[in-house]
C-alpha cells in the first residue's frame, strides 16, 4: 500500500496544506521547527489515530482554532481507500470512504505504518510501558481483533481496580466474576503478543545478522507477568495466579498480574541489551524497525508505509547504508525528514523532494549529486 495524497486543515502549524506523493521515496527537507515532523506525524496519526509526540489532541489543533482534520487517499492491493480523521473539543471522528467508524478496531489497520523516530532509541532502556505500547501499535494494525480484546481487558481491569479501592472487605463472588472476564480477555491479549514476538524475533534476528555483518545475534524474549510454558496454559495459569494474589491485590488496591504488567527483553549475543553500547542499541532498533516492515508484509500480504523522522543524523555512515539497503530491498513507500541532504548522499536519484517552510510544503524534485 502507499499513500497517494494527504490534506491537512488546521493541523499543528498548517492552516491548510496538501501534497501528492510518489510510491517510492519521499523526503521532507527544511530548517528545524518549520513543520517537517508535523507532516510526518499527520501521516502516522491518520494510520494509528495517535501521535508519537503528545497525548493531547489539543496540541494538534492550529492556534485559536477549535478543530482540525487529516485526510488522505490510500492505494491498497484491494483498491483505493479514502481515510479521514476529524479532531475537536467534542472528540474524534474516523471515516473510511466517508463512512463513520464506530470503533477504533474498525478503522486501525486500514493503513499500516512503521515509524522510526529518535525517541525509539529509548525502547530498550525505557520503561516497560514503552515496550507494551510498541506491541500494541503493531498488533493493532496487523490484527484488529487484538485491539478489541485489549480494549475489553482494559475496561475490566479498570473496573476491578476501582472495586479494590472502594471496599474494606472483599466479596469473593463479585471478584470472581471480574476475574473471569479479566482472564478471558487477558489470556487472548497474551496469546496475541506471544505469537507476535516469536515471529518478530525471527525477522529481527535476520536483519541484525545483516547489519552486524554476522558478528552479533539478536534475540527477543516476551516477559509475561503470568508464568506459563505453553500457549495453551495461559488461561488456567492466569486464573490460578490471579486468585492466588487476591489478598495482595486487596492490600495494594490494584491488580498485580496480567498483560498490563508485560515486558520485552532484548539480548545481543545472549547478554541483556541494557548493557550494550550506544552503537549496538542503534543497530538493534534499526533491525527491529525493518523486522516490523517484513512481518507486516508477511502477515497481511500488503506493504506498510515506512516513516523515518530525523533518524539519519542519529546513525553513522555504515548504519545509514544498511538502512537504505534494507529500504530498497523491502520496496515500500518511505518518508524521510531531514534538515540537510548531507546525510542522504546514498539515496537513489529518483526521489520526491518536498521543501517545508513555516507551515507550507512544496514539491521540488531534484537529482542528488
From Swiss-Prot:
Family, similarity comment: Belongs to the RecF family.
HAMAP family: RecF (MF_00365)
GO molecular function terms listed in the Swiss-Prot or TrEMBL record: ATP binding; single-stranded DNA binding
InterPro entries xrefs: DNA-binding_RecF, DNA-binding_RecF_CS, P-loop_NTPase, RecF/RecN/SMC_N, RecF_2
Keywords (A to Z) from UniProt: ATP-binding, Cytoplasm, DNA damage, DNA repair, DNA replication, DNA-binding, Nucleotide-binding, SOS response
Keyword DNA damage: yes
Record's function text: The RecF protein is involved in DNA metabolism; it is required for DNA replication and normal SOS inducibility. RecF binds preferentially to single-stranded, linear DNA. It also seems to bind ATP.
Binding positions (ATP): 30-37
Entries under NCBIfam families matching the protein: recf
The name this protein goes by in its record: DNA replication and repair protein RecF
Main subcellular location: cytoplasm
One CC-aspect GO term: cytoplasm
Annotated localization: Cytoplasm
Pfam families linked: SMC_N
Species assigned in the record: Streptococcus equi subsp. zooepidemicus (strain H70)
GO biological process, one term: DNA synthesis involved in DNA repair
